[in-house]
Amino acid sequence: MDYVLTYADRGFSGNPYAAGMDRTYSLDALPQEYPSLGTGDYRNIALNIKNEKGVESADLLFKSYEIRSGKYQLQGLPAVWADENEAQTLEIVLADENAQVEVHLLYGVLEETDIITRSVRIKNTGTGQITIEKAAAACLDFVQGEFDVLRFYGKHAMERNLERTPLGHGTIAFGSRRGTSSHQYNPAVILAEKGTTETAGSCYGMLFVYSGNFSCEAEKDQFNQTRLLLGLNEELFSYPLAAGETFTVPEVILSYSADGLSALSQQYHNCIRNHVCRSKYVHMQRPVLINSWEAAYFDFTGDTIVDLAKEAASLGIDMVVMDDGWFGKRNDDNSSLGDWQVNEKKLGGSLADLITRVHEQGVKFGIWIEPEMVNEDSDLYRAHPDWAIRIPGKKPVRSRNQLLLDFSRKEVRDCVFDQICAVLDQGKIDYVKWDMNRSMADVYAGNLSYDYVLGVYDFMERLCSRYPDLLLEGCSGGGGRFDAGMLYYSPQIWCSDNTDAINRTRIQYGTSFFYPVSAMGAHVSAVPNHQTGRVTSFHTRGVTAMAGTFGYELTPALLSDEEKQQIREQIKTYKKYETLINEGTYWRLSDPFTDEIAAWMSVSEEQDHALVSVVRLMAEANQATVYVRLRGLKPDAVYLEEQSGRQYSGAALMHAGIPLPPFTREYEAYQFAFTEVKEAGTLYEKVRKWCDRNAKNRVVISLYGGSGSGKTTLATALQQYFLNDGTGCYLLSGDDYPHRIPKRNDEERMRVYKETGEDGLRGYLGTKKEIDFDRINEVLAAFHEGKDTITLRHLGREDGEISSEETDFSGISVLLLEWTHGGSDDLHGVDLPVFLESSP
């Protein structure tokens, strides 16, 4: 591919000394794999190293490379994992002897997953100290192309809103300096070619496997080239490296799609489910939980939790989670963080007793923790005020009346870890929600933010190792630390503190660009919603929450019997489709920021099942019909919509779509479940072969069998298969050809039975006495004769509702007769009888 590189004398673009007098060779104009400061490349850099004299320069030259089986791993950091035969590692070593530094570029290639990972190890090979001032994990240079930058901005309770910006000359930069990946920007970016849509166009993704400060820079330079960088934020970062020490830059996951944004998202979803999350629960059905927070906040007792468990069990909920307020003197958010001892007075007994009482109700038990925090009004702070992060000589910045414990220090982590383990060892705790409700402010050293995050990872690694059966859910005021680093330890993260169903459609939409549905904590909450005051129906809240891990945040005792029954039905529905929702291929069908609906769907791997969810976001008088086009189906397959019983071809569903019912109220929601009629495809192949062997201009095929054999479903699907291949096919129901309308025919059957018994009834059913075989035989004969117009009979439900209609049969070469009596000896003109023994 070196032919794409061009060389010219670029004014004011310097030339490396090694290039001699060649003024056409400039690092300022050529793509770089890992650009550094001080080389004559004036674009944004990946690496900046300062030596003991304060010189900032690193001229990295190729030293060696190695390709090996398996995927590299990173000590103390989360990273993509793979079996030995699923990945390869490329390691490129760059060196600057003058700066006395080696840079190891690590590439993990997961070919079947369409994923490449990148990380960097920086080694001080000298005798003195060096300082890393900036370190990106990956750099991508493009010599041409017009791109849009897709980033995901937000705030507390409204995270990961998609913003698409054309990349003009200069730099688009975003990131976090809050100590976490943050609510404000997610550590992820997409570079999409102009015009790229959900289903077409080229796009490149980068996802940082890290939960702390990060920086992303997209730059279009003077020569219309593009550079994309993602890595550690250089602000508040200055990492000293002593002689012989090595620093590891966290990993970036890269992927590319030539088929639009949906395909890119699906590649990331598969990677996270199968190569990032390690929890045993990632591919398991997870418990539907109810959390005590919105039901009680801090105002609860042990009896309150048990009562909640009783209600939960009666509703089919699997687990009760006791949220904030069970420890120390924690009756509000001003005290006791750091004192992880059970408040037995508040609970009315020991935690072990409470766990037993909850389990006796037939539900599991979960608990809330916030290990990284401390209140000044706590025994821990009074004993160790120096354990809170603060700048010496300066009062700390408070947030939510709490301070941040210095998890970069092992003794701090060990103390809190021992406290948490003492709690978890008191009984069978099935679930833990790990929260973090403030950002880092008092950064006292350049290494703090990085070492802090590694301390959190160390704590979580120890927790997961000690309690492998524990379901861990991450949280940081909702989605303030929703990143791939956290998903390495917890298979799900509370998506947002905002549980409003309408806001959630947008939050979950933005989240889905990189993260799978199985990672998104989503619950049905009470109305008016506690964050927005909005009122939406129970059904709408349920449909939205089913695009996540599904659970409840409300007080069951305040619900009506009708609402409680809705919960039972919602749980049944969710559990029926849970595997499809969490493991299926996810498709975005609308943009809830611009469209009048939010719509999404999940399709099974075999493309034989699909669940479509739609929420109306606006309502207006005399509203036009809204159509939803589906994606990811087999074009030639026939699908049965479970609720209506209607059948559609995959092509029709994807190109024409399905019309939504007229709305009756604001914020309505709908779900449509589709199942492929597989037997029709198998039957079609056999019938098609028969037709090809027995070449006739017109063929009559009779599908017959007893009640419940699936004649109607199969015949409708078979007709669609013929139409799909361009064969004109008409479906005729034999139910229009009894002598009498159904009501009168039932009366006649009863009369015959009363007068002649069972033998007489058998002599009536399906014979010429009941059926007008002469009339239907005339239809079949006219069809075989090639007539273009044939008179068909229509039988209604009431007296006098018997009519005839001239029907156009021009272009029809296959007549499908669907009828219980389609195998009768009195029926003439059938070319291929097909008997159905049982329901498909």
Q: Could you say what each language-model-derived stretch is?
A:
Residues 1-219, 235, 638-644:
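Polysaccharide-binding surfaces and accessory modules of carbohydrate-active proteins
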Residues 346-350, 382-539, 549-554, 558:
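Active-site neighborhood of glycoside hydrolase catalytic domains
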Residues 58-62, 239-258, 670-674:
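Short Pro-Gly-centered flexible turn/kink motifs
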